[in-house]
A protein has these predicted regions:
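C-terminal helical subdomain
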Residues: 178-179, 186, 190-232
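Residue(s) in the substrate-gating loop at a strand-loop-helix junction
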Residues: 138
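Active-site loop-to-helix junction immediately N-terminal to the catalytic Tyr of the SDR YXXXK motif
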Residues: 144-152, 164
Length: 254
């Protein structure tokens, strides 16, 4: 970690902050000396002692509700570090699905939610010297993931959003990083098999990459390995996905 982290003395807002990666970011920001952390949560009643002894102020926030997002921006005028972490994964396929609205819900949270927050807080960040935006994305958005129906396209859209935001906000001095996350030990990924990373480690890797001035950063071993494997031979990867999908249909009937 650089001698002085960009998180030190910062005023941060983290969406989806009461569990998983979001909670990991809250803890890591506090450890790096953040002055204040706004914890954006959909239901403040869902908060118990997660933030005990941390410099946290809970903010009611649903990233799909533009009125709430604007209220958060108005009520948090000192933010200079925004962590867009809130996410939704429904575990449905994109085309052959029994829930045709699942993909729309995933796009609303994982793409439009990030866009809503970025639009609302861009003026706040600009007024506070430029600041930083960290978008918590997924390896499923770095290449097509057929097992993650609407989630994969939504995260891919958010990856492009990150790049465009970086260009648009460059003049006001806002730095933007896209964090490519693999498999993490969270409630949202409870169904995923295999090795999973600790959410705090993801936050630590993400903030370290922000300190280094990176634009896009893999936060864990799975993200690094999967992206490299796809880059080596995307056709072979896609054929492998087709075989796995066929096996899944035979095993589950879906």
């Amino acid at each position: 970690m650089p001698r002085t982290s960009k998180a030190a003395g910062s005023v941060a807002l983290v969406t989806g902050a009461n569990r998983g990666i979001g909670l990991g970011f809250v803890a890591e920001l506090a450890a790096r000396g953040a002055r204040k952390i706004y914890a954006g949560v959909r239901d403040p009643g869902d908060v118990s002692d997660q933030f005990k002894e941390l410099p946290v102020e809970v903010v009611p926030l649903d990233v799909t509700d533009r009125a709430l997002v604007q209220a958060a921006a108005a009520g948090c005028p000192d933010v200079n570090l925004l962590v867009n972490n809130a996410g939704l994964f429904t575990n449905h396929r994109l085309v052959l699905t029994d829930d045709p609205d699942a993909a729309r819900r995933e796009m609303e949270v994982n793409y439009f939610g990030v866009l809503n927050m970025t639009r609302a807080f861009a003026p706040v960040l600009g007024a506070n010297g430029g600041g930083y935006i960290a978008n918590v994305l997924s390896v499923a958005g770095a290449f097509p993931a057929p097992f993650m129906g609407g989630y994969s396209p939504a995260k891919a859209a958010a990856l492009f959003l990150s790049s465009i935001t970086r260009s648009e906000l460059a003049e006001q001095g806002t730095e933007v990083i896209a964090l490519i996350v693999g498999s993490v030990d969270t409630r949202m990924a409870a169904h995923v098999q295999g090795r999973k990373e600790d959410p705090r480690d993801i936050a630590r890797a993400g903030l370290t990459a922000l300190d280094r001035g990176e634009y896009v950063a893999d936060t864990d071993f799975m993200a690094i390995e999967a992206r490299a494997r796809y880059a080596r031979d995307p056709v072979r990867y896609e054929r492998g996905m087709i075989k796995l999908l066929k096996a899944t249909v035979m095993d589950t009937g879906r």
